[in-house]
């Protein structure tokens, strides 16, 4: 197997993981690899290395730009995710309501549920709207740099964000002025 096809399969695996939000160890690795089946930890190692050195963000921007016509951009969804971090991690904190350590992130998806952007994870001791203006700027500037037009998008967010953004005034400012 060539290095190029190997990397394509690794990227397909990562995209599947991001779309399904399944735990790394639960993913069906044998269905992704045509040659030697890689262990999920090997694929996670690639993802972690690429994320840390900025390569994944570049690749993600290229993927979004290349396939932008397949995205459902009639509206975008904004939501938060709380992930249990039983073994700890770089950005985890105790969340009282869940009685465990968690990490939180904000996601933007298209109308089909395809992930477009994800914020930098924060400690679970913070709620979804922690540093909301900075988080939204981070999310939508990344989308802009990939060639997606975000100005004027219809944004669907849950009620927690409505409270934090004063009926979406901050979100609208971000979407129209990036």
Where are these regions (language model features)?
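Short alpha-helical elements
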Residues: 1-178
